[in-house]
Design a protein with these regions (language model features):
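Short alpha-helical scaffolding segments that buttress acidic/His motifs in well-ordered protein cores
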Residues: 37-41, 82-90, 104, 124, ...
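C-terminal charged capping/lid subdomain of soluble metabolic enzymes
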Residues: 139, 149-222
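Flexible, glycine/charged-enriched surface loops at secondary-structure junctions
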Residues: 47-56, 70-81, 96-101, 153-157, ...
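A general structural signal for well-ordered alpha-helical segments in protein cores
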Residues: 34, 61, 101, 120-121, ...
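Carboxylate- and glycine-rich phosphate/diphosphate-binding segment that chelates Mg2+/Mn2+
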Residues: 1-96
Length: 222
């Protein structure tokens, strides 16, 4: 697999109009919405995060969590909230990078033609569990932005677990599968792990990783 990145790929103008999104199928809305949530969460915990990017990411997490379910049901409010949320997430992560969830998702999409947002959504809870030991103290703010009830009264471990549970629930609510069963082939895991480790997003992950550890993450998603 070859990654192609060039400044000529970046548009000079982007028209973000929720009315133009009203014909999107539910599955596409769910997948792209969960990709946007992954942008915001990974951008918030990445090694390169800063005060300004944190501001964008937390607001994006709030907007996406509040509006993705409605967008999947094609409500005008949901579409508008998601249009704004995904745009704000892009303003954040494009300045600080992403992490292991995206690096693992890229290979899946290339090898199996799995929609990128679906791959991100399935891997995100696993990535959060993996990164909890080094970035778990930041999960409380993510959970708070997602509207997790009682999170201020929880200790850090409880808040992290509640945040991961909220991510899983949102993904399930919009129809995303919970694992890679039927998608991932065990014989491809070595290749995928090597590709993920070499991916441009991998160095931004808050926890340093290895090909062997990524292999175990893939295996856990079967």
């Amino acid at each position: 697999m070859v990654n192609t990145v060039d400044t000529n790929d970046i548009p000079e103008i982007a028209v973000v109009d929720p009315d133009m999104m009203s014909s999107m199928p539910k599955g596409l809305t769910a997948a792209t919405g969960m990709d946007a949530l992954t942008h915001a969460i990974e951008g918030y915990i990445t090694k390169g995060h800063c005060t300004i990017s944190d501001m964008f990411h937390l607001e994006a997490i709030k907007l996406i969590s509040e509006n993705l379910r409605g967008a999947v049901q094609n409500t005008p409010e949901g579409r508008e909230g998601m249009a704004l949320g995904q745009y704000i997430a892009g303003m954040g992560f494009s300045n600080v990078g992403l992490g292991i969830v995206h690096s693992m998702a890229h290979g899946l999409s290339a090898l199996y033609d799995t929609p990128h947002g679906v791959a991100c959504a399935i891997i995100l809870p696993t990535g959060l569990e993996y990164n909890k030991s080094v970035a778990g103290e930041r999960y409380r703010a993510v959970g708070k932005a997602m509207g997790v009830t009682g999170i201020d009264e929880m200790n850090d471990a409880e808040a992290a677990d509640a945040t991961i549970a909220a991510v899983k629930q949102l993904s399930a609510d919009v129809g995303i599968p919970a694992n890679l069963h039927g998608i991932l082939k065990e014989e491809d895991i070595q290749f995928l792990a090597e590709s993920a480790f070499a991916d441009a997003c991998c160095p931004g992950n808050p926890r340093d990783t290895s090909v062997e550890e990524i292999k175990e993450l893939y295996k856990g998603l079967l």
